[in-house]
Amino acid sequence: MTQAHTATTVTTVSVDSLRQSARSHALPDDAAWRVDDVAALFALPFNDLLFRAQQVHREHFDANTVQLSTLLSIKTGGCEEDCGYCPQSAHHDAGVKAEKLMALDEVLDAARAAKANGATRFCMGAAWRSPKDRHLEPVMDMVREVKAMGLETCVTLGMLKAEQAQQLKEAGLDYYNHNLDTSPEFYGKIITTRTYQDRLDTIGHVRDAGINVCCGGIVGMGEAREARAGLIAQLANMDPYPESVPINNLVQVEGTPLAGTEALDPFEFVRTIAVARITMPRAMVRLSAGREAMDEALQALCFMAGANSIFYGEKLLTTGNPQADRDRALLARLDIRAEGYAG
């Protein structure tokens, strides 16, 4: 998103006020979150932070309902970018082979299966730096057909030009995913082939086209808490902030530069979910990659912290995700309903 798309009005809020009463849950919508303000939320006692996040969550959502989303890799591997976490990068030897774009019928079969299993949102990801115009038409066909099934549609295709965003809007796309990944200061340690401003520009094109924005990041890449606070501040200060905020916990894949990175403390991941909920109270906060390594108690804490969507199914692009039966069993034990699912 360009500077024109970013909130610039700053309301002064003291760190002390952020620590005070749990009644003052979040800043007014016209305020901007300073990194120090977000860091102060991270530093709250764990129980206080979760209590505040749960209060904010209940003001805007049914705390016992989650949305189930399914993510399908429609074009895997061979990406020109050098993202240090990604096994689909052509720069890394992670054993992921480049594949062609999936056929429409295959995608629709996957979408039907996702809907039958309770998903209300179907996301399609392609490992491109940016789509060529000739690639966009088949993707738009996928969007039209999946939307006709009654599913929300989301795609993530890399960087977009303004006219490409407009074409996707005309095809009926509901959401476009383009993550910031981390804070501006830490970004260069993870990616060198695409600038932070490139990402902001694509988000700006998506917003200008009238498509809902899905934008979040990845934690556990060796960053300090300040970088996590910086990421949340960037997201929360978008005008408006994203409708969907996926929070990913790094999945370490052999052959990628980030393999062997010290794992993030699980409670710090929960704190990140809670801070995202407080700073972006009306967003769908999506518990995304990394759930395969989380036990049920940790996932339950994430729901308490304000996560209200999960990616559902056996694969999340090229890494593991808890199987659907396990997900349904966990939600049943927690008395959490899947949005729009009566199965």
From Swiss-Prot:
**Keywords for this protein:** 2Fe-2S, 4Fe-4S, Biotin biosynthesis, Iron, Iron-sulfur, Metal-binding, S-adenosyl-L-methionine, Transferase
* Catalysis: reaction(s): (4R,5S)-dethiobiotin + (sulfur carrier)-SH + 2 reduced [2Fe-2S]-[ferredoxin] + 2 S-adenosyl-L-methionine = (sulfur carrier)-H + biotin + 2 5'-deoxyadenosine + 2 L-methionine + 2 oxidized [2Fe-2S]-[ferredoxin]
Q: Which Pfam families match?
A: BATS, Radical_SAM
Q: Give the record's pathway.
A: Cofactor biosynthesis; biotin biosynthesis; biotin from 7,8-diaminononanoate: step 2/2
Q: So what EC number does this one have?
A: 2.8.1.6
InterPro entries this protein is in? Aldolase_TIM, BATS_dom, Biotin_synth/BioAB, Biotin_synthase, Elp3/MiaA/NifB-like_rSAM, rSAM
- Provide the residue positions that the database annotates as binding [4Fe-4S] cluster: C79, C83, C86
Q: What role does it play?
A: Catalyzes the conversion of dethiobiotin (DTB) to biotin by the insertion of a sulfur atom into dethiobiotin via a radical-based mechanism.
**Summary of subunit composition and partner proteins:** Homodimer.
Write down what this protein is called. Answer: Biotin synthase
